[in-house]
């Protein structure tokens, strides 16, 4: 699985004007299941992100996790993280998991983040979503399993 993690002051996701999820300080996690991924990869990635120390401590160092700060997570599916741009001008997405697998793993990943004790909001798999965020730092991290 692949994830693009952004430390945010706030973030929200809407579909057709309907607010699906919003958070205050925490993490916006854009996530993509890849061909061959399973629940083990989704669980491992969620556990790593839950422990990722990218929030400032009292000394201003990135030494605290989202759990340590009492922050939340907004988890949004984004199959375009599977883009292959090695040839031509149009990205290919064949490395992404098939939609049924992608949705199952997206839901599993979000549930695993929540099981780590992190308040979790989500988008809608496969929908045309509008994501708003106020990046804090900015801090943006790429992770893969």
Swiss-Prot record:
Motif mapping: Gly-cisPro motif, important for rejection of L-amino acids: 137-138
Subcellular location as annotated: Cytoplasm
Domain of life according to the entry: Bacteria
Gene Ontology cellular component terms for the protein in this record: cytoplasm
EC number, as in UniProt: 3.1.1.96
Reaction catalysed by this enzyme: glycyl-tRNA(Ala) + H2O = tRNA(Ala) + glycine + H(+); a D-aminoacyl-tRNA + H2O = a tRNA + a D-alpha-amino acid + H(+)
Job description of the protein: An aminoacyl-tRNA editing enzyme that deacylates mischarged D-aminoacyl-tRNAs. Also deacylates mischarged glycyl-tRNA(Ala), protecting cells against glycine mischarging by AlaRS. Acts via tRNA-based rather than protein-based catalysis; rejects L-amino acids rather than detecting D-amino acids in the active site. By recycling D-aminoacyl-tRNA to D-amino acids and free tRNA molecules, this enzyme counteracts the toxicity associated with the formation of D-aminoacyl-tRNA entities in vivo and helps enforce protein L-homochirality.
Free-text domain note: A Gly-cisPro motif from one monomer fits into the active site of the other monomer to allow specific chiral rejection of L-amino acids.
Protein known as: D-aminoacyl-tRNA deacylase
């Amino acid at each position: 699985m692949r994830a693009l993690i952004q430390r945010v002051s706030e973030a929200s996701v809407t579909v057709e004007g309907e607010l699906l999820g919003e958070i205050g300080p925490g993490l916006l996690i854009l996530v993509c299941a890849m061909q061959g991924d399973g629940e083990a990869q989704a669980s491992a990635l969620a556990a790593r992100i839950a422990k990722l120390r990218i929030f400032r401590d009292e000394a201003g160092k990135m030494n605290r996790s989202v759990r340590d700060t009492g922050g939340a997570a907004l988890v949004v599916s984004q199959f375009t993280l599977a883009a292959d741009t090695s040839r031509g001008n149009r990205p290919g997405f064949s490395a992404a998991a098939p939609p049924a697998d992608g949705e199952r793993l997206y839901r599993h990943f979000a549930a695993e983040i929540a099981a780590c004790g992190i308040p979790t909001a989500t988008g809608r798999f496969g929908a045309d979503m509008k994501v708003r965020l106020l990046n804090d730092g900015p801090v943006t991290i790429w992770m893969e399993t």
